[in-house]
Structures are given as structure tokens and as C-alpha cells.
């Protein structure tokens, strides 16, 4: 395994240490989140009860295949802990997310979370944000939550 992949795996394993029994968690999308899902799956297989709100169909399928129960955002009042990767992050801890095309779902999950942990390898650290292209996305998942939020503003 190359160093970049080892960093992703270590970051994911460190974040997974924050998972506790009976948590509702937000599971992110991407190459670093992949390692988190594997670790959370090992914990679930060992008996930890986790419910997950996922940020993409790919994450949903991977979570289910690793013994993690998946729910919709409408099925919970809050997410105890969301863990996701970032596309870029600067030294002020400002970050860019959503390059994988799951921006809206990522925002919905993060907005329901009591706490969020961002995981990444060192290649994501940049001097200046903006080198990464960002998608704009509108989709049915969580539509009512977004609509209600817009009405409040």
C-alpha cells in the first residue's frame, strides 16, 4: 500500500475510534471514507449497533455490505457524529467538499450532525483553496429538509 493510502487508512481508523454503540452516524463518500466504512463495518460485525445516514448511493451500498444499518435523514432527528473526507483544506481549516458529486447529501448529513470529523491525507492540504472543481447539485434525496431550511431563511 502506498503512503497516501496508508494516511487515508490511519485517518479513518482514528476517526472510527469516536464511534460508540447505538450511535446514528453520517458516513461520507470518497476514497478516505471508504476506509472508515470498512472499520465501522468491522465494529458493527463485532456487535456495535450503528445506524448510518449516507452521503451517496455508493456509500449506502458499501455500508450495507459491511453490516451497517442504513436509514434516511428523515428517519432521525439528529446524527450523533458525521465523518467525511474533504477535497481541499487550508491551514485555517477552511475546506472544500463535494467534488465527488455528493455535495447536497453531504450538506444534509452534516447539517443534522451534532459533531463532524473531516478526514484526509496530506495531499488535501493546500495554501489556497480553489484549485478543485466543485459541482452544483439538485436531487430528490432530502429535498423536503432543504426546502424547509430555505423557507426559514
Regions found by a protein language model. Give the residues of each.
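N-terminal active-site beta-alpha-beta segment that forms phosphate/nucleotide-binding
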Residues: 1-86
Amino acid at each position: 500500500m502506498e503512503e497516501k493510502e496508508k494516511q487515508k487508512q490511519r485517518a479513518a481508523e482514528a476517526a472510527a475510534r469516536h464511534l460508540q454503540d447505538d450511535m446514528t452516524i453520517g458516513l461520507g463518500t470518497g476514497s478516505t471514507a471508504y476506509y472508515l466504512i470498512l472499520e465501522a463495518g468491522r465494529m458493527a460485525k463485532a456487535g456495535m449497533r450503528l445506524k448510518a445516514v449516507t452521503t451517496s448511493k455508493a456509500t449506502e451500498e458499501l455500508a450495507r455490505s459491511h453490516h451497517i444499518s442504513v436509514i434516511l435523514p428523515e428517519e432521525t432527528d439528529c446524527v450523533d457524529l458525521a465523518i467525511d473526507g474533504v477535497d481541499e483544506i487550508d491551514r485555517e481549516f477552511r475546506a472544500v467538499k463535494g467534488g465527488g458529486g455528493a455535495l447536497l447529501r453531504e450538506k444534509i448529513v452534516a447539517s443534522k450532525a451534532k459533531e463532524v470529523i473531516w478526514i484526509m491525507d496530506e495531499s488535501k492540504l493546500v495554501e489556497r483553496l480553489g484549485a478543485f472543481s466543485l459541482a452544483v447539485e439538485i436531487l430528490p434525496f432530502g429535498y423536503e429538509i432543504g426546502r424547509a431550511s430555505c423557507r426559514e431563511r
